[in-house]
Amino acid sequence: QQSSTDPVHAFPENLRWTVGAGPGAVVFVTINLPGSHNGRDSGAALTQHNPAREAANAHWLRQAFAHARAVSASGVVIAAHANPGFEADSGLFGSVRTPRRTPEDAYYDLRRLLAELATQWPGEVLFLHGDTHRFQSNQPLRDAAGAPVKNFTRVESYGWPVTSSWVRIDVSPGHTPLFGIVKRQATPG
């Protein structure tokens, strides 16, 4: 299903589909999330577009989690381009901090929304992204008290110049963890 949060479908990147049924179902969601400071450094025309895009993304994510509940899914997979700055409040590169907004943090609201949705969701959440070109798999989100959100996993795929490696994601309904993450090395042909 494509997002219909606006009359002219200004955000065709926002898609959703479901694989499976009942407790084995997984809901897949894509959102329009550009890198480079969430598109805020892209010139006046694109910068004016950002509030509407960010609102559409938030609405679309809320709808996706509501849909996941309605179909009794076990997991939600969210795919986007940008690394939404998980490191800013995860403690991955320093001490764990309570998340707080700073003027230069273009992704703060998205991370808070993801933490809210994940903590209210009984299943697993997998966030897939690229952007910073290095493999990462961790649980970077923190709740409002600074505690890890344990059912939220982020996987960042390899990017240039690491073009000989890839990531395999296995989905195992009825098992814990629901998502298996395996790094792979391409074999020379």
State where each predicted segment sits.
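His/acidic metal-ligating clusters that form di-metal
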Residues: V27-V29, A44-L141
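A short, acidic, flexible beta-alpha connecting loop/helix-capping segment that sits on the rim
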Residues: A79, G159-V162, A186-P188
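Extended active-site neighborhood of metal-dependent phosphoesterases/phosphodiesterases
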Residues: Q1-A56, W60, S137, L141-S172
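A short C-terminal boundary segment appended to hydrolase-like catalytic domains
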Residues: S172-G189
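Short, surface-exposed linear patches
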Residues: G43-A44, P99-R100, A106, P148-F152, ...
